């Protein structure tokens, strides 16, 4: 059963997907895109979770967490030039019971629109550098 449109999901934004000013479209391009559900694990707890299981220092460090509402994601997909019906499917993992996937293939153009709609969360208790604003 797909994740409800009222839920919010997050995705780790690591240095390989961040150009210093914005997230790269490759963050969402492709199929079976991994996300995590805030209804299962709160945002504050995702920082440690992503640092332990997504980060791969020194070349891949967690910079930010991007958040989007599932309904907003679906609206972006339906409104895209080549309409795409996006769903978020729960796929719990041992390391992340909040893990889910967007199974549909997302084009670079659609991924660009999704990335622009993300709410970007900086690490807790850290001041953003001017280049990150």
Residue ranges and their predicted role:
Residues 1-5, 17-18, 23-133:
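Conserved NAD+-utilizing ADP-ribose enzyme module
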Residues 9-13, 17:
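Betabetaalpha-Me/HNH-type nuclease active-site subdomain
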């Amino acid at each position: 059963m797909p994740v409800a449109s009222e839920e919010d999901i997050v995705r780790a934004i690591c240095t390989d997907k961040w150009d210093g000013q914005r997230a790269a479209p490759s963050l969402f391009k492709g199929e079976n895109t991994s996300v995590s559900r805030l209804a299962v694990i709160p945002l504050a707890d995702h920082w440690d979770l992503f640092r332990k299981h997504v980060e791969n220092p020194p070349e891949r460090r967690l910079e930010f967490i991007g958040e989007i509402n599932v309904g907003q994601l679906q609206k972006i997909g339906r409104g895209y030039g080549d309409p795409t019906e996006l769903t978020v499917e729960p796929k719990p993992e041992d390391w992340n019971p909040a893990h889910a996937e967007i199974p549909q293939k997302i084009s670079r153009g659609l991924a660009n629109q999704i990335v622009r709609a993300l709410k970007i969360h900086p690490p807790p208790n850290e001041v953003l550098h001017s280049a990150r604003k």
